[in-house]
């Protein structure tokens, strides 16, 4: 049964499922805010440690629409920290595994998957109609990361980022009207890839 058939023929059942699945959110959020979450569309770049947990957490919170991107497959080395990495998913595409996991949590969640590297060929589609973007890209994916922030800023989309330095965590938000990603991390086009990565790491822990 395709998703569209499920949605068309069982919408009443889906509404009841959604209400029951999110009823314990009320108090943390209002019913009006829960309705907004259901209509929201979030783009998550990277389905590894951070992105996988972001997706499953947001699905459980009741967010109804996602764009997810990752070109990689799960490996044994991922099992210590990535939500979708299990013995049964080794070698499988991360976007496919995480999409299936999301639909198992909320059967009618809307997902659009991008299984190639984020680049000029797909960045506008990835951000199309999105309310918020989440940067969970690999530390080495700086060209894709810079493109993500630049296009999101141009489209008026906030980008949330987080990182786990040591046994702590950092979180930041780049809003369109605030300091740009390039300015905050002091990135310049004449920097080498290593210099860009080093500046990014330092910027994640400015007090460290």
Task: Name the predicted role of every residue range.
Residues 1-43:
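N-terminal charged helix/coil linker that caps or initiates catalytic domains
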Residues 5-10, 65-106:
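Glycine-rich phosphate-binding loop and adjoining beta1-alpha1-beta2 segment
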Residues 44-46, 69:
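Conserved N-terminal Rossmann-fold NAD(P)-binding element of oxidoreductases
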Residues 50-51:
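Hydrophobic/small residue at the entry helix of a nucleotide-binding pocket
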Residues 95-132, 136-145:
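A structured beta-alpha segment of the ubiquitous adenosine-cofactor-binding alpha/beta core
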């Amino acid at each position: 049964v395709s998703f569209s058939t499920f949605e068309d023929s069982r919408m009443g059942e889906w509404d009841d499922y959604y209400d029951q699945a999110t009823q314990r959110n009320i108090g943390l959020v209002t019913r009006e805010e829960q309705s907004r979450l259901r209509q929201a569309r979030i783009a998550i770049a990277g389905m590894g440690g951070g992105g996988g947990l972001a997706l499953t957490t947001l699905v459980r919170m009741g967010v109804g629409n996602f764009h997810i991107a990752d070109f990689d497959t799960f490996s044994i080395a991922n099992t210590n920290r990535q939500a979708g990495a299990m013995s049964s998913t080794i070698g499988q595409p991360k976007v496919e595994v995480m999409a299936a996991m999301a639909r198992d949590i909320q059967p009618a969640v809307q997902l659009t998957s991008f299984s190639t590297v984020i680049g000029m060929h797909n960045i506008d589609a990835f951000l199309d109609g999105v309310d918020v973007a989440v940067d969970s890209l690999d530390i080495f994916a700086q060209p894709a990361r810079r493109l993500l922030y630049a296009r999101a800023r141009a489209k008026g989309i906030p980008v949330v980022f987080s990182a786990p330095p040591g046994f702590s965590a950092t979180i930041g938000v780049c809003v369109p009207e605030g300091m740009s990603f390039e300015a905050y991390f002091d990135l310049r086009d004449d920097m080498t890839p290593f210099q860009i990565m080093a500046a990014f790491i330092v910027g994640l822990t400015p007090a460290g």
